[in-house]
Amino acid sequence: MDIYKISSSDLTNIPFIKYIAAKNKPILLSTGASTLNEIKQAVKAIEDVSTGDIAIMHCVLAYPTDYEDANLLMIKNLEENFPDYEIGYSDHTKPDENMFVLITAYNYGAVILEKHFTLDKSIKGNDHYHAMDPEDVKTFKKNLEFLSKLKGHKIKQPLICENSARKEARRSIVANMDIKKGTQITKENIAFKRPGTGISPSRIDDIIGKIANVDIHYDELIDFDMLS
């Protein structure tokens, strides 16, 4: 077996956890009905005997889980307490029409999503009625792909699609009147106007007090070459 899943019911079964961990394979550790301290003990038990990967799965041990009991923010809490491990979500809620529970779990940082699957939700038993069927999977896949597009990149920086607006919508320093050669640049004889292709207003301190070495016309973009 390439990956082992330890269910929530065995989270405190430390001898069993160590037995599985000794196989040195990746482990999915479900955490339903557990305290943070119990999870830490289970993780340490794995770490003591294994160098395999560990994924810690937020889970609510209730079948089905009511939406108000899903507590998806616990995914964030697990991230904070176990920054070295991937965090996932094992879902027992009934599928909603947009698969919003799983989508939200992904948006909160779950990188592994576990959900029961069935071909027929009407089959008797404790697993089928809250499982995904093929149509649910299609909906989930479609919405997950859409959300992935929306999430984009993490690092804040100008985007290619903003290049034109960055130039045209930003302000530049311009002459607020005709400025004769030899005139000192002051706050009174400049203004800030579009486009943003000249000197940024953020550099106002770099030009105040400078002397115009050419005639600068009203509304003309001021350039450093015009100043001394």
Question: Where do the protein language model's features map onto the residues?
Answer:
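Catalytic cores and adjacent flexible loops of soluble metabolic enzymes
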Residues: 1-228
